């Protein structure tokens, strides 16, 4: 009889444990929720995805916009890490999602494509590291930082676009992306950390003159293709040489008789004082007179 009671008690405890898994209260406004294979933390009226049922046979995951009417705003650190069954993840429906945590998709070795939508503001360090099947990444968001090792060791990565909102690329962000052949970097990037493109032997960077990207490429012996035309100081008409025609055009511009493009204005500021005036005219004339074409 004692064995029978003990057995019934064990069954009761197990049933109670499973029941509690679907809603575990942590505080007055914080509890766990399990639904559709996801584990959520409801906190401050927002849902954070913090885990996934690895035994779930679904390989294509769509992150929802809400859970129990609470907006899904974050994917917690390591939420999907080491999920080798996962082949695709979609954020299209998750319009409340603002951030992806550290290691969130670390070593999800079967994912082939990631599309980061415009409403997402931040990506955590190591977020997609070791996603070795990842081929394409499209970033349409307002992220300002590609953090440390975010796409490190994504050995199949062939294509990624980096939006103009990005100002900083962290250390080893793309290390060992051996399949990556080209990447365009905007003028807005102000910092590229050491090793950002370490061991990317097939990479060519595309960008602009006099930028951080150009300097980084030169310092690290990475091929660099310019997307703009080199502006020569004093070449006001942008014909590739400095002569009397530039002086005449600049005089007309100062007199209000001609209009210059942005590049021409940059070239016209010969003494680099950010003022276009007769001093620049004189300086260009002197330059020409000395025969320094």
Q: What is the predicted role of each segment?
A:
Residues 29-35:
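Cleaved targeting-peptide boundary
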Residues 37, 42-46, 56-74, 84-99, ...:
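Structural signature of tandem-repeat unit edges
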Residues 101, 117, 124-127, 140, ...:
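Periodic glycine anchor positions in long extracellular repeat architectures
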